[in-house]
Curated annotation (Swiss-Prot):
This is Capsid protein. Residues 29-46, 54-65 have a biased composition (Polar residues). Belongs to the potexvirus capsid protein family. One of its GO terms (molecular function) is structural molecule activity. One of its GO terms (cellular component) is ribonucleoprotein complex. It comes from Shallot virus X (ShVX). Keywords: Capsid protein, Helical capsid protein, Ribonucleoprotein, Virion. The keyword Membrane does not apply. Residues 1-67 are annotated as: Disordered.
């Protein structure tokens, strides 16, 4: 078909010409491309629409590393958060069972009373506690019931949020905050297991987290913790610490002026 025949066909409006018929669907049921005639008499095929025979994309499962768990397994494992600085709930339950074996009237408030005493006096294993739990046992005896399962600080860290919120709510900062060098705006962070307040492993108190740690409290506790580490090293490694201080002094010492000769 030449250009003159094509123009005549378009002018007549005949849409049933041989070159305008749709090719029947193929075996797959997908309409075949429709041929269109150009001015030069050449056939050009245009797609009939739809996705047609596009190649199927590979599924994500085919690309999954065989050494990785499934998505459901990852969600199951990461649903619980445990930190080795905070005693897990199972350990706290064992401690309560041990206490109740000695004191039948013991309740969870006795365990919290020990954490509250350490809130004011420290949770070091060397701390001296002269107070008593509500059930009648002394805190000094209570803190020795579970030496093998958790440290005193790990135990107290479980109650860190409860101690922090109670202290702020009752306006009772740790008793030794000033002696430890905390500023006024950070005094409620002046207990040595404050960092557990920011841990997901420490449960929130029954009334929820009514108070959140401020930036000043977080910074104040961080600086105090670093100073405690320095003091601990000074007391146990006096020789090496003194050498470090001398080395720093030599580094910071101003250089001697050059000698001028004539």
């Amino acid at each position: 078909m030449n250009e003159e025949d094509l123009n005549r066909l378009n002018a007549s409006g005949d849409l049933n010409g041989a070159n305008n018929q749709r090719i029947p669907a193929g075996p797959s049921g997908v309409n075949q491309p429709i041929p269109s005639v150009t001015a030069g008499g050449q056939n050009q095929f245009r797609p009939s629409g739809g996705l047609g025979n596009q190649g199927s994309r590979p599924t994500e499962s085919s690309n999954q590393d065989e050494l990785l768990p499934t998505e459901a397994e990852i969600e199951a494992i990461t649903s619980d958060v445990e930190s080795n600085s905070v005693a897990p709930k199972a350990t706290i339950r064992e401690i309560l069972d041990t206490l109740q074996a000695k004191r039948q009237n013991a309740t969870p408030k006795d365990l919290f009373s020990l954490a509250w005493a350490c809130y004011h006096n420290g949770s070091s294993r060397f701390v001296n506690l002269n107070t008593d739990a509500p059930c009648g046992i002394t805190h000094a005896d209570l803190k020795t019931l579970w030496k093998a399962s958790a440290t005193l600080r790990q135990f107290c860290s479980y109650y860190a949020k409860s101690c922090y919120v109670s202290g702020k709510q009752q306006k009772k900062p740790p008793a030794n905050w000033s002696r430890k060098g905390y500023p006024e705006e950070a005094k409620f962070a002046g207990f040595d297991f404050f960092n557990a307040v920011l841990s997901e492993s420490s449960p929130a108190p029954p009334g929820g987290m009514r108070f959140k740690p401020t930036q000043a409290e977080i910074l104040g506790h961080s600086m105090n913790a670093k100073m405690s580490i320095v003091e601990s090293r000074q007391s146990s490694h006096m020789v090496s610490t003194r050498a470090d201080l001398l080395g720093r002094q030599q580094i910071n010492e101003q250089p001697k002026p050059p000698m001028i000769t004539f």
